[in-house]
C-alpha cells in the first residue's frame, strides 16, 4: 500500500516521502498513530500543493534574510562602557547588549543569532557575524567606546 509519511518513521521514511509499505503495517501502526496517510490521488495533490507552498515560503525567507543582510552591513552599533587604565573595559559587551542596540535601531534579531565567540573586552571596532538564515550570514560592525 502506498502511503504519505506525515512524520519521520525510523527505518521506513521521512516526512513527505511517498512509499510502499505492507498493508497491515499501514493500517495497524502508521494510520492509527497518525504517522502516515493513504496515498490517494486527492491526498497526493494536497501533498504536492503543500510542498510547493513550503518551497515558496523558504525562498521568501531567504530573500528577506538577504535584504536584511544588506541593511545591517551598512550599520555600525556604538556601545558605551566604563573603562579603566589603559583603555581596559570593565565587564564586557555581550550578544544581549548587541541585540538590545539592534532592537533600538528597529531590527528584530534574537541574541542567539549573534555569533559572538567571546564577549568583547576591548575598545574599538569589532566585526560580529550574525546568522540571519541557514545560508545567509551578515557582518555587523560594533564600536565599543569609553563612556
Swiss-Prot record:
Which is an annotated Pfam family here? Ribosomal_L9_C
Q: Which biological process annotations from GO are given for this protein?
A: translation
User: Which regions are flagged for Basic and acidic residues bias?
Assistant: 45-59
Region (Disordered) location:
40-60
- An example molecular function term from Gene Ontology annotations: rRNA binding
Q: Which SUPFAM superfamilies does the UniProt entry name for this protein? A: L9 N-domain-like, Ribosomal protein L9 C-domain
Tell me which UniProt keywords the record has, alphabetically.
Ribonucleoprotein, Ribosomal protein, RNA-binding, rRNA-binding
Task: Provide GO CC annotations from the record.
Answer: ribonucleoprotein complex; ribosome
The keyword Nucleotide-binding belongs to this UniProt entry's keyword annotation: no
Write out the similarity annotation.
Belongs to the bacterial ribosomal protein bL9 family.
User: Do you know which PANTHER family this protein is assigned to?
Assistant: 50S RIBOSOMAL PROTEIN L9 (PTHR21368)
Quote the function comment for this protein: Binds to the 23S rRNA.
Q: What is this protein called?
A: Large ribosomal subunit protein bL9
Organism in which the protein naturally occurs: Exiguobacterium sibiricum (strain DSM 17290 / CCUG 55495 / CIP 109462 / JCM 13490 / 255-15)
Query: Which gene produces this protein?
Result: rplI
Amino acid at each position: 500500500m502506498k502511503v504519505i509519511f506525515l512524520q519521520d518513521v525510523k527505518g521506513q521514511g521521512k516526512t513527505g516521502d511517498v512509499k510502499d509499505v505492507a498493508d497491515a503495517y499501514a493500517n495497524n501502526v502508521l494510520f492509527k498513530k497518525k504517522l502516515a496517510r493513504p496515498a490517494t490521488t486527492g491526498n497526493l495533490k494536497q501533498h504536492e500543493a503543500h510542498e510547493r507552498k513550503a518551497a515558496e515560503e523558504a525562498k521568501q525567507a531567504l530573500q528577506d534574510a538577504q535584504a536584511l543582510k544588506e541593511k545591517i552591513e551598512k550599520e555600525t552599533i556604538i556601545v558605551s562602557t566604563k573603562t579603566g587604565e589603559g583603555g581596559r573595559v570593565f565587564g564586557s559587551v555581550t550578544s544581549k547588549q548587541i541585540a538590545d542596540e539592534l532592537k533600538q535601531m528597529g531590527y528584530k534579531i534574537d541574541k542567539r543569532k549573534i555569533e559572538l565567540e567571546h564577549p568583547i573586552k576591548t575598545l574599538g571596532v569589532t566585526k560580529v557575524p550574525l546568522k540571519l538564515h541557514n545560508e545567509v550570514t551578515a557582518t555587523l560592525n560594533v564600536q565599543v567606546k569609553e563612556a
